[in-house]
Regions:
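Short, charge/polar-rich alpha-helical segments
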Residues: 3-38
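Short E/K-rich amphipathic alpha-helical oligomerization segments
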Residues: 13-16, 32-61
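A structural micro-motif at secondary-structure boundaries
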Residues: 90-113, 175-182
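Minor-groove-contacting beta-hairpin "wing" of winged helix-turn-helix DNA-binding domains
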Residues: 165-177
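Short, charged, intrinsically disordered terminal tails
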Residues: 2-13, 80-84, 181-182
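Positively charged, aromatic-enriched patches within helix-turn-helix-type DNA-binding elements
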Residues: 102-106, 113-149, 157-159
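Amphipathic alpha-helical coiled-coil segments
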Residues: 61-84
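Alpha-helical initiation/capping and key positions within long helical/coiled-coil segments
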Residues: 28, 35, 57, 61-64, ...
Length: 182
């Protein structure tokens, strides 16, 4: 059985003129890759516990999953290219810069990490503890520090006139939401 992992998913339109759609597809493909990575980790962890026949079957499954992941990576790379073409919001990891329509701002390391995780996963809510662990890998920082960085990011987005907001929902956390294009 051959899977066509590099084919677009239903509803995917690489010709979209909306950069928020591109960010959604980036998030989807990144999540698919991470999901498959988790499956592979479980398979490798459990492989030695299986009978030889089951081990061979699992090895076939691993090849299929790796092929799917390669296809997802191709699609992810296409979306990263597309978002750059859309003349929209760009992140420069080397310079820790955020750019939008000819305006830019240099971010601190933590500001950049926070913006990146929110932009990589638009509309997904992150609790303070998730931000501390996933964005900064420093779970021992104080929750107030997250709130301070969120305020700083909001201010930068207003200054650059970026059409998105960092919202906070009680019990859910923080998420980046795009405003409708006008």
């Amino acid at each position: 059985m051959t899977d066509e992992p590099s084919q677009p998913l239903d509803g995917e339109d690489l010709a979209t003129a909306h950069w928020e759609d591109a960010r959604h597809w980036i998030s989807i493909y990144a999540d698919l890759i991470e999901f498959k990575r988790g499956i592979l980790d479980r398979i490798w962890r459990d492989l030695t516990k299986l009978q030889p026949v089951a081990q061979r079957a699992a090895e076939v499954d691993v090849k299929i999953i790796e092929g799917q992941m390669q296809g997802y990576q191709v699609r992810l790379d296409l979306w990263y290219t597309r978002i750059r073409e859309l003349n929209g919001l760009l992140l420069d990891p080397e310079g820790r810069m955020i750019r939008y329509k000819g305006k830019d701002a240099t971010l601190t390391v933590r500001e950049f990490q926070l913006v990146k995780i929110l932009l990589d996963h638009p509309y997904r809510y992150f609790t303070v503890s998730q931000i501390l662990k996933e964005a900064w890998a420093e779970p021992n920082l104080f929750p107030e520090e997250v709130r301070n960085y969120v305020q700083r990011i909001r201010k930068i987005m207003v200054e650059l006139e970026i059409p998105c907001d960092v919202v906070n929902r009680l019990g859910r956390g923080y998420a980046l939401e795009f405003r409708a294009q006008q």
